[in-house]
Every structure is written in structure tokens, then in C-alpha cells.
């Protein structure tokens, strides 16, 4: 009888261990999924709004809602990138007035909102559009549906206050701080970091232009990409966790 109870007790203990292990694994999986869901959303409206400033009606910031190739596959598996809508942001108030619409379109199309913090002028962009148009006509290309947007993308900061985008693909703040230090030590020496915005899997440093040769001193760190006229992420809330392999 003693052996029976001993065997029965050991069996219960083993079952309890099994249940505990399964429960622990279940909560681990739930935690991983929850972290992934949290990582799929970025809302930088309030951070970016303070950088929107124009001195006249002829100036704007280019904002586009885009479905990026890594967020969907269409046409038999071929990757495609689509611009859902473009906005010409003239003030922080105008950005605020469009916030719900922008968020709604991003949610509806599983898309991302990007904004270029190099301020544009309608005059400069219009002149660039004429230049592009002349080239298209010369080559008998009459597809001009995105002419103005293309011209805006090829036009720099209208006020001379250029900003660069440094894309760091890690959430490790020690790495981010080291890159900030390297950039500030680059010529011209001084504080060049304008702001830092979170992305899905890292950060965008917005900086003043610097000598890129100093980047070799960060070769042992997480690699970065430097862009002199690229947009930063304004809003994204991806629905599909398969798309979390991100590089903005």
C-alpha cells in the first residue's frame, strides 16, 4: 500500500512538472507575441510636430503614405511599392488636422507615413518639375502622374538648413549614444544631432551634415545608413508580424 501511494505521489509530481512546463512555455510565447505586437507600432507625430515651421505660404514639408514592398506581395509574388497619398504640410496645425486621416489610411492599407524634414519651396520644386518634364518629353515619356512628388524628392532644403537621416538598426541605446558621439566628433566638430525618432527596430538620428569619413571609427558597432534627403517615419502600425524584419 505504501508503494502504491509513493508511486501515485511521484506520478502527480511528474504531471505537475509537465503542466508547469507547458504553462511556462505558454506565457513565454504570449510574452514574445506581445513584444512583437508592441514593436509593430511607431507614432512620432508629437516628436516630429515641433520640427514643422514655415516662414511663408510657399513652403512645405513632403509627407507620403506608402505601402512598402516588404509589407505585402502582389501580382503573383512580385514585390511592389505604392504611394497611397501625398500631403504638403504647411504648419504643425495642418499636420494635426490631418492626423486622424493619416492614421486611418495607414491602418486601412497596412501602410507607413513618412515625412521629409528638409523644408521645400513650391518655387524650387516647380522649377525642378519643369526640368524633369522636359527630360520626359525629350524621351517621349508622358507619364507625369507623380511629377510634382518626384520633383519634391529631388529638391533639397529651401532654407539651406539641411538635415541628414542616420538609420540605426538596433534598439541598443549604448550603440546609439556611441554613434551620436562619433557624429558629433566629425567635422565640423560640435553638436550636430537635431533629434532622435524611434523606428520599428531602431532609431532615426536627424543630424546636421558631417564628414562621413569618420564613420570608419564605428566599424565595430552596429552598421548604419546615412541619407542626405530621405524621409523619416511618422506613423506605422503593421498588422502582420511576419513583416517585422525591418530596416527603415
Description of each model-found segment:
Residues 206-208:
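Short hydrophobic/aromatic beta-strand micro-patches
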Residues 10-12, 28-29:
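Short, positively charged and aromatic/hydrophobic N-terminal segments
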Residues 217-225:
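C-terminal, non-catalytic extensions of nucleic-acid polymerases
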Residues 25:
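Cationic, low-complexity basic patches in intrinsically disordered or flexible, solvent-exposed regions
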Amino acid at each position: 500500500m505504501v508503494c502504491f501511494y509513493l508511486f501515485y505521489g511521484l506520478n502527480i509530481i511528474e504531471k505537475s512538472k509537465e503542466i508547469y512546463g507547458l504553462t511556462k512555455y505558454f506565457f513565454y510565447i504570449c510574452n514574445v507575441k506581445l513584444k512583437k505586437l508592441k514593436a509593430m507600432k511607431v507614432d512620432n507625430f508629437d516628436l516630429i510636430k515641433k520640427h514643422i515651421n514655415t516662414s511663408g505660404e510657399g513652403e512645405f514639408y513632403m509627407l507620403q503614405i506608402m505601402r512598402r514592398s516588404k509589407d505585402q506581395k502582389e501580382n503573383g509574388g512580385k514585390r511592389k511599392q505604392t504611394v497611397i497619398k501625398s500631403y504638403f504640410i504647411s504648419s504643425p496645425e495642418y499636420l494635426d488636422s490631418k492626423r486622424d486621416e493619416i492614421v486611418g489610411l495607414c491602418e486601412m492599407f497596412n501602410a507607413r507615413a513618412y515625412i521629409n524634414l528638409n523644408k521645400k519651396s513650391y518655387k524650387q520644386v516647380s522649377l525642378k518639375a519643369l526640368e524633369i518634364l522636359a527630360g520626359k518629353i525629350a524621351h517621349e515619356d508622358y507619364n507625369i502622374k507623380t511629377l510634382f512628388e518626384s520633383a519634391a524628392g529631388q529638391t533639397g532644403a529651401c532654407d539651406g538648413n539641411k538635415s541628414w537621416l542616420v538609420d540605426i538598426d538596433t534598439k541598443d541605446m549604448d550603440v546609439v549614444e556611441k554613434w551620436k558621439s562619433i557624429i558629433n566628433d566629425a567635422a565640423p566638430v560640435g553638436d550636430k544631432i537635431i533629434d532622435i525618432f524611434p523606428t520599428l527596430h531602431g532609431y532615426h538620428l536627424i543630424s546636421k551634415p558631417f564628414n562621413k569619413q569618420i564613420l570608419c571609427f564605428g566599424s565595430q558597432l552596429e552598421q548604419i545608413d546615412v541619407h542626405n534627403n530621405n524621409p523619416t517615419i511618422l506613423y506605422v502600425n503593421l498588422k502582420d508580424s511576419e513583416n517585422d524584419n525591418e530596416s527603415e
